[in-house]
Regions:
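Positively charged n-region of N-terminal signal peptides that target proteins for export
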Residues: 1-4
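N-terminal hydrophobic alpha-helix used for membrane targeting or insertion
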Residues: 6-7, 214
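Bacterial N-terminal signal peptides
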Residues: 7-17
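Extracellular/surface-associated beta-sandwich interaction domains
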Residues: 22-778
């Protein structure tokens, strides 16, 4: 292996006391003030996420999930189905200055522009942020003029894509080159030129000569000199690799990278005049990352988005809200319902009937269509008030869950559900963060003020929890106060998700709505719904750093009523929430071994091994499951147990299909010789509505082997011998085992046992997606 770096040739609201609406019910006139502009051209970069079973188009200029050129939806799930669940999405943000002037940036369909590429200018030394050290809740980034030059908008009109596997590969290669380690170095291959270009071209630093913040995209600073230098082992920063855990989850405010594949970009709201909303600019710099994971469960049909929002301007904004807007069209756009789960901080869209018809040439989902949701995991920091604001917590002394009353929570700026905030009743003062505090909606075909917003003030009214004209939203019916109650509600269509009546500030509505309030119980006409999830109000100070993290979750039931797919989506969301709670440190099963095949006459010799890049190197895999096994007193580790090799029917069969005997069949298996052989998982069956036992492996329990002779075609009819000069396809997976407690659905004492004792590979030994290995006997 060469000892020199390939890098050498790369050359590389008003004041807090006011709560008025910004438009009255009969006032639709709005004249934006003249504001300075940087004359940046609109962003043009776009990218399609497609690492897992979702294909999602995103744009540098803030527009999400929309193919604007064709005016069609571009969030496809499952990938390759030609069926789409979301038409558009974007961030909204707004607040008022000391004079009551509204500042706002938002998008719907990007018919205009409120966002442009690139970082904004700052005055060095105005903040206290240092990414080398852990960062607490008093973090302030540099702020200043908050401007940008047009050439810098052009320079940053791009995405920076990186994969965790590439960073791991670079680390191992660098450490061997630098003499940090010699173990396994003979097996280490150099990163490709493309991989090195991505690492050396990582935008770790802004141009200080142009007034930009020196620290830009997150990077791992191996020698802690504050400078990004891959020659010294620095690289894009994933905090969950190679045994590292530098960022204390939930405490340290530094941002690292997440996901198996990550797309990072930076944009702002000061590049030019706001032509989408006509709002006055804030001076906001947004550092975004879109990421996903390849798995063999529901996470494979999820995507995630983290936004680090920095107020680079010198003005303080009051009554500020940050919001996630989503125009989710489940197949056919015209027949949807919307709703939310208050306790989860989850907004969702589902079909208004049990058949999603096609719309012209755009395919619907057909019978039992899915539901799509957006979980608002975390939002901005709540204003400091010198106390640890109340929220649900587990009392170790009494071993019970303690939940404050709605009255107590409202009086002390607390919460009553874990899913709508972070940092409450955790013993730490002033680290509380908002979750989803408003859920509003509108319909494209409705009359004003129940339809799309126009000027900035109408966007802001939806963010505050009001209709476009500033009129209130009510519990029941369509939320208009007609056909429902006269009780105000912060959340539209909560269903039965709010047993503590948080949305109505403690007023019990179960007498009027014994089955909860959703679109089905109100018999609403379905339509083209859009929704807004908001966090706030809070005070946005110069240099303030906030984060929004959201996840798009998908669920589909094979039978049941209108809410069946919503319930399936919520089950998926439980995994999404657990993944967020673990700071996206996903449980990684043992990597698939390297599979090589020797071709003989009417015979194939399949050989497996685990290079040093594998998490199962020397078959020593052991991984803690912090997502599904939450009891710290039990054994939470999965440990390597064995291998399985499958013959695939065709080259296009994926790892997700290995349980389908029409597509994949087991041809070889081995496992450690111990007391573990037959392993059964209990998996939820949508049709039956409960978990059923599924045999995952019937182990031969004869010890580990690394070569296997295959002489028969598992798919052959009649004569089964392998045919010379015919192509066959195989995949090998490793599996691990944990049974901290036996599970038995018939025994009340064992209902909290391990339902999933078996997990198998989701990625290759080198971090890439698992793909078939072909062989031709001859």
């Amino acid at each position: 292996m060469k000892k020199q770096f390939i890098a050498a040739f790369l050359g590389l609201t008003v004041a807090c006391t006011q709560a008025l609406a910004y438009l009255g019910p009969n006032d639709k006139d709005y004249k934006p003030t003249v504001k300075p502009k940087a004359n940046c051209s609109p962003a043009t970069a776009r990218l399609t996420m497609k690492f897992n079973d979702v294909s999602a188009l995103i744009e540098q200029g803030g527009s999400m999930f929309q193919n604007r050129a064709a005016s069609v939806a571009a969030y496809e799930v499952p990938k390759g189905s030609n069926r789409f669940a979301i038409f558009a999405g974007a961030l909204w943000m707004g607040g008022t200055d000391v004079n009551g002037q509204l500042k706002l940036a938002a998008l719907r369909y990007r018919s205009g522009n409120d966002f442009w590429p690139g970082p904004l200018t700052v005055t060095p030394g105005t903040g206290n942020f240092n990414p080398i050290n852990p960062v607490g809740d008093d973090a302030v980034r540099d702020f200043g003029e908050a401007n940008i030059d047009p050439d810098q908008c052009i320079a940053y009109d791009k995405f920076y894509t990186i994969r965790k596997a590439e960073v791991i590969k670079f680390n191992l290669w660098w450490e061997c080159n630098a003499g940090v380690t010699t173990e396994g170095c003979d097996e280490i291959t150099a990163p490709s030129n493309d991989e090195l270009n991505r690492i050396y071209g990582w935008p770790a630093h802004g141009d200080v000569s142009r007034g930009q913040d020196y620290f830009l995209a997150p990077f791992y600073d191996r020698d802690q000199d504050g400078n990004y230098n891959p020659d010294s082992g620095d690289h894009p920063w994933y905090d969950d690799i190679l045994g590292r855990d530098d960022i204390e989850c939930g405490i340290d405010r530094r941002i690292s990278l997440y996901g198996d594949e990550t797309h990072w970009w930076v944009f702002n709201d000061k590049g030019n005049i706001h032509t989408e909303t006509n709002g006055d600019p804030i001076g906001m710099e947004i550092r975004a990352q879109a990421f996903s994971f390849a798995t063999n469960d529901e996470v494979n049909r999820m995507t995630f988005y983290n936004y680090e929002l920095i107020n680079r301007g010198t003005q303080t904004l009051y009554n500020t809200y940050f919001s996630q807007y989503l125009d989710a069209d489940v197949g056919n756009y015209a027949d949807d319902y919307t709703g939310c789960d208050v306790s989860r901080g989850l907004g969702y869209m589902y079909n208004g009937d049990l058949i999603d018809e096609s719309d012209g040439g755009k395919l619907g989902y057909g019978e039992n269509p899915p539901a799509i949701g957006c979980d608002f995991f975390e939002g901005p920091y709540q204003d400091a008030d010198g106390i640890d604001n109340p929220g649900p917590f587990y009392d170790e002394a009494t071993q019970t869950e303690v939940v404050p009353t709605v009255v107590d929570a409202l009086a002390n700026n607390g919460i009553v559900y874990k899913g709508i905030g972070i940092g409450y009743s955790d013993g730490i003062i002033d680290n509380e963060r908002f979750g989803m505090r408003r859920f509003t909606y509108y319909t494209s075909t409705s009359a004003y003020p129940y339809n799309d917003p126009g000027p900035a003030a109408e966007y802001y009214n939806f963010m505050e929890g009001q209709w476009a004209n500033g009129s209130e939203m009510y519990y029941g019916g369509l939320g208009t106060g007609t056909g429902g109650s006269q009780t105000l509600s912060d959340y539209m269509f909560p269903g039965t998700s709010d047993p503590l009546h948080w949305s109505t500030q403690g007023e019990d509505m179960s007498g009027l709505y014994p089955n909860g309030w959703d679109e089905t119980t109100s018999n609403n006409p379905s339509g083209d719904r859009r929704f807004v999830q908001s966090a706030g109000p809070f005070t946005l100070r110069p240099g303030a750093v906030n984060n929004i993290t959201v996840g798009i979750v998908y669920g589909r039931s094979t039978e049941g009523g209108l809410m069946a797919s919503v319930e399936a989506m919520k089950r998926a969301d439980t995994k999404a929430q657990a993944l967020f709670d673990a700071c996206f440190k996903i449980l990684s099963p043992p990597d698939a071994p390297r599979l090589t095949i020797q071709e003989l006459e009417n015979e194939l010799i399949l050989m497996i091994d685990n290079p040093i890049s594998s998490n199962n190197y020397q078959e020593a895999y052991a991984e803690i499951d912090e997502i599904n096994i939450t009891d710290p007193t039990v054994d939470r580790f999965y440990r390597f147990e064995g291998y399985q090799i499958f013959q695939l029917k065709a080259q296009d069969v994926s790892i997700a299909d290995i349980a389908d005997p029409d597509k994949a069949r087991l041809v070889a298996q081995c496992d450690i010789k111990n007391n573990i052989s037959r392993i059964i998982n209990f998996q939820f069956d949508e049709a039956l509505g409960f978990s059923v036992p599924v045999e995952k492996v019937d182990g031969e329990n004869s010890g580990i082997r690394h070569s296997f002779s295959v002489k028969e075609d598992a798919f052959a009819q009649g004569a089964r011998a392998l045919v010379n000069h015919k192509t066959y396809y195989y995949v090998a997976v490793a599996y691990a085992y944990n049974q901290f407690k036996e599970y038995d659905p018939t025994d009340p004492l064992l209902l909290d046992g391990q339902k999933i004792p078996y997990i198998s590979s989701r990625l290759n030994y080198d971090g890439t997606a698992i793909s078939p290995t072909s062989a031709i006997p001859h």
